[in-house]
Amino acid sequence: MTNKIILALEAEQMTKEIPTFAPGDTIVVQVKVKEGDRSRLQAFEGVVIAKRNRGVNSAFTVRKISNGVGVERTFQTYSPQIDSMAVKRRGDVRKAKLYYLRDLSGKAARIKEKLA
């Protein structure tokens, strides 16, 4: 049983509109990057390989291949650093955690698209 004050604070922080996505989906995350005194948006596009649903502590991991090297980045879902998220493609997978994609490369690492 959690404290009502904590629940109220967490509900207040979870006001951001988050699109519905699941592991296997390809998403584009617009991240706020601060360089010196100016700020800009940087897009990170990849496949969601893990999702952790814990209220305000929710997080998800996105994997992409950049110049032949696998890059993974974990985002806090309700972080103020995330400007926006968009789902580009729905993936058809049977597992909740797609860590096996780390060992695959090229065409073997493709994910089938979910049709309707």
UniProtKB/Swiss-Prot annotation:
InterPro entries in UniProt: Ribosomal_bL19 (IPR001857), Ribosomal_bL19_CS (IPR018257), Ribosomal_bL19_sf (IPR038657), Translation_prot_SH3-like_sf (IPR008991)
Coiled coil: none
UniProt GO cellular component terms: cytosolic large ribosomal subunit
Xref: Gene3D superfamilies: 2.30.30.790
Keywords (A to Z) from UniProt: Ribonucleoprotein, Ribosomal protein
Record-level Gene Ontology MF annotations: structural constituent of ribosome
GO biological process assignments: translation
Family per record: Belongs to the bacterial ribosomal protein bL19 family.
PANTHER family attached to this UniProt entry: LARGE RIBOSOMAL SUBUNIT PROTEIN BL19M (PTHR15680:SF9), RIBOSOMAL PROTEIN L19 (PTHR15680)
Its biological purpose: This protein is located at the 30S-50S ribosomal subunit interface and may play a role in the structure and function of the aminoacyl-tRNA binding site.
Name of protein: Large ribosomal subunit protein bL19
Organism annotation: Pseudomonas fluorescens (strain SBW25)
Name of the encoding gene: rplS
